[in-house]
Design a protein with these regions (language model features):
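NTP-binding/hydrolysis catalytic cores, primarily Walker-type P-loop NTPases
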Residues: 9-13, 110-127
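Phosphate-binding/switch region of NTP-binding enzymes
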Residues: 57-118
Length: 127
């Protein structure tokens, strides 16, 4: 299954919010500039109908030109990083791009996942 088949599915037509996890694994190999342009235009057409699209991608699995085009045309770009600091694994969400924000945006946000609780934002890191 590729990204084209996913975008052609009936579920995409009906959804207000579209989340495609590991979208980089669905991207075709060997895309030329026209293929990249067509995919971006297709995603823009879906978004222009008032629907939101969220794609999670692994930059190492994806065509770098396509990734650059997607990041350039996205309203919001978030990067997740992990660092080992003093024996602790620190996870950080970096707000790389946020167009039309209503106010100031915190550029880095610490987070963790706790068993039984789920996703937790470190409020000491958010101002």
């Amino acid at each position: 299954v590729g990204i084209d088949q996913v975008l052609e599915s009936e579920a995409i037509e009906q959804a207000d919010i579209i989340i495609i996890d590991a979208a980089s694994s669905l991207m075709p190999d060997g895309m030329n500039d026209q293929d990249r342009f067509n995919l971006i235009q297709r995603l823009r057409r879906i978004a222009s109908t008032g629907r939101s699209i969220m794609l999670t991608v692994d930059r190492d699995e994806m065509d770098h030109k396509l990734l650059h085009s997607m990041r350039a045309s996205a309203e919001v770009v978030l990067d997740l990083t992990t660092n080992l600091i003093g024996g602790d694994l620190k996870r950080t969400l970096i707000v790389t791009r946020y167009l039309r924000a209503a106010g100031p945006v915190q550029s880095t946000i610490g987070w963790r996942v706790e068993p039984g609780m789920g996703f937790i934002v470190d409020i000491t890191a958010v101002s």
